[in-house]
Amino acid sequence: MTSVGPEGVSSCPHPLGAALRAHYIYRKEAVVLTKLEVLGLRSLVPTLPLNEEGDAGNDPIQILGINGLGPVKANITTAPFGAFDGEALSGMSVPKRNIVLTIGLHPDWAVQTIEELRQLLYNYFMPKLLVQLRFHSTNFPVVTIEGYVESMEPNIFVKSPTIEISIICPSPDFVAMSPAVITGISNDGSDTTDFEYIGSVQTGFYLKVEKAVETSGEGSIQILLSGEYAPQSFSARGTLDDNVRFEMNTVPGQKYVRSVDNTLGTITNYLNDISYDAIWPTLYPGVNRLAIITTVAGQNWELSYYPRFGGL
């Protein structure tokens, strides 16, 4: 089993010429957020690092607070029974996330002004702009979330000016920047590959199976996944050949089952060959036990996924 960890992200200089930094350390039960990076997704806007290095009192941009990092309140819908007390669950979902940044401005008066810092932040946080936030912490990998700026409200005519920025994130989860990768060999289901999923909410994955020993070509490929939850079983047909690999994706909104020619890039779709009782497998927090079953055992497989977190 191999795992690919998150890579460090280098900081870019800002248009005023010096590194633009700000402190923010959030402590809760030994979990420490050490750095926030803001990426403007418009062209020509560099990364804006807001970090813990150096003296917070000397940083021109300082994060005074961040709200909206905890788990988002779920929408639980129920319907009343007609003949007896109580209600029946009819659905549940987690809506958008609203992150609110409170930022203080403390320019180096020899080279900067309050207005210059405020105009710099406008490049990132003008309402309707899409931004990406990257959070660094002591207990999590580097995670990212994207959202749209709802509002940016500067408090201009005060002695210590601040700016409050509201960001709406349609997808509420924080997602690891780098994937975890696990490899193994297919078998008859008698052996499993056990690994721990560190995320706090379930996630889909990408699976690739390639020929390693002689096989008949098209055949059955089955995924068995279990752990601290109900077992999941998924069975479909796929082709394994010297130049053809099997792929599937179980991420909601991106699902597919197919075989791909490594040379020509042609794709054979197998969505219509999924078993009627198949459950699209997802990883749950905790230990997951995975078995990949092929018509002829001994084929190479690789599974990759991005851990997801419902709160920091």
Where are these regions (language model features)?
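Short beta-strand and beta-hairpin "edge-sheet" elements
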Residues: 127-173
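Compositionally biased, low-complexity regions
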Residues: 93-100, 105-128, 132
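Polar/acidic, low-complexity leader/linker segments enriched in S/T/G and N/D
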Residues: 10-77
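Intrinsically disordered, low-complexity segments enriched in serine, threonine, and glycine
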Residues: 175-312
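Oligomerization/assembly interface segments of phage tail-like spikes and tubes
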Residues: 84-109, 159-173, 288
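Extreme N-terminal basic, low-complexity initiation segments
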Residues: 2-5
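Solvent-exposed loop and beta-edge segments used for protein-protein assembly and interaction
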Residues: 93-97, 125-127, 157-161, 199-201, ...
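SsDNA-processing nucleotidyl-transfer enzymes
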Residues: 71-91
